[in-house]
Amino acid sequence: MTESDSDTVPTAGPIQDGPHQRLARMAGDWEGLYRLWFERDMLASESGQRGTLRAVLGGRFLLHEYTWEFDGRSYAGVALYGYHIDERRWECAWADSFHSGSSIMFSHTSGDADPAHFAVLGSYGDGQTPPGPRWGWRTEIEQADADHINITMTNISPDGEETRAVEVEYTRVRPVAGAA
């Protein structure tokens, strides 16, 4: 099997329609605006972000690799998005050289997910010794049209207070005509 064979969405079977086709439509090269908040309503940073989303493992998953900047330094991240057919839920594994340290955040929807709306919830520790209560982290992905994706990440305190943490506004990078 060639790499291209393994990265395409099948034309028959349980992943040819619905959520997996939704993921496949997001495949491509993207660039846009990255915004970061540490405190409610206090924008900490705004920079460019470049990312590539590509279908992997026969279209079962979407791999997102990206770079962004904060305070004059470059950072990178990777996420694997998928829809678990048997569990009827969205799932995500995410790591970022700024946000997650040496951990991988695993997130998923609880209960039956809306296959048309990617929204997952994970959690992380407070970094203290001894560990305190865990904080929630919700990731939502909206694709308004073929050329625009918005990714929103929300921080959720142990008390349930929600605060915007990250927003990415992507525009699809179209190949330049005549470029090799």
Residue ranges and their predicted role:
Residues 1-180:
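Hydrophobic small-molecule pocket/channel-lining residues, especially in calycin-type beta-barrels
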